[in-house]
Swiss-Prot record:
GO terms for molecular function: ABC-type heme transporter activity; ATP binding; ATP hydrolysis activity. Part of the ABC transporter complex CcmAB involved in the biogenesis of c-type cytochromes; once thought to export heme, this seems not to be the case, but its exact role is uncertain. Responsible for energy coupling to the transport system. It is a peripheral membrane protein. GO terms for cellular component: plasma membrane. This is Cytochrome c biogenesis ATP-binding export protein CcmA 2. Gene3D superfamilies: P-loop containing nucleotide triphosphate hydrolases. One of its GO terms (biological process) is cytochrome complex assembly. It comes from Salmonella paratyphi A (strain ATCC 9150 / SARB42). NCBIfam families: ccmA, PRK13538.1. Signal peptide: none annotated. It is found in: Cell inner membrane. SMART domains: AAA.
Length: 205
């Protein structure tokens, strides 16, 4: 279980959110919503331990995150707004960098992400959407329980969004957790996703 307790965050003397508390249990996914500058990415960075809140605490499995960073990071898949891939490498080589023991599974993961036939193409030659798919192919390889995804559908077409949404649904059905930001609808998942709205210093589930 991931828990946020009374989180408070300020940026440039402006309160992004205050008194924010919620939990994400096994089998749940949460969509963080809000306008530009509402603090969506900042909240995800707090939840992953990449930044510290100005008040409150994040807990993982009942322990303060700052005390269990190693075990937490073994349980975490974080994909930020930028793909975080190496453009000099091919799609296959990028996945091998993150999952060196899964060589036999890489082609299937890339195919699931819509990159069949592009396995050995340098990422620099791929479109923005294809580069995003390289990063998201990790969803078919990772063994992490908690997925935190910042705008995963950027530059992804409708069919790709549907495929990725099905993968997230399968992950939560198996007891995994997903937290994501997106402005796009989640096809077939509207009834199962909780929404956390950040609105001008306040938040509501």
């Amino acid at each position: 279980m991931l828990e946020a307790r009374d989180l408070h965050c300020e940026r440039d003397e402006r309160t992004l959110f205050s008194g924010l508390s919620f939990t994400v249990d096994a089998g749940e996914w949460v969509q963080v919503t809000g306008g530009n500058g509402a603090g969506k990415t900042t909240l995800l960075r707090l939840l992953t331990g990449l930044a510290r809140p100005d008040g409150g605490e994040v807990y993982w499995q009942g322990e303060p995150l700052r005390r269990v960073r190693d075990s937490f990071h073994r349980s975490l898949l974080w994909i930020g707004h930028q793909p975080g891939i190496k453009t000099r490498l091919t799609a296959r080589e990028n996945l091998h960098f993150f999952h060196p023991g899964d060589g036999a599974r890489l082609p299937e993961a890339l195919a699931q992400a819509g990159l069949a036939g592009f396995e050995d193409v340098p990422v620099a030659r791929l479109s923005a959407g294809q580069q995003r798919r390289v990063a998201l192919a990790r969803l078919w390889l990772t063994r992490a329980a908690l997925w935190v995804l910042d705008e995963p559908f950027t530059a992804i077409d409708v069919n790709g969004v549907a495929r990725l949404t099905r993968r997230m649904a399968a992950h939560t059905a198996q007891g995994g957790m997903v937290i994501l930001t997106t402005h796009q609808p989640l096809p077939g998942a509207a009834d199962t996703v909780r929404r956390l709205a950040l609105t001008g210093g306040e938040a509501g589930l």
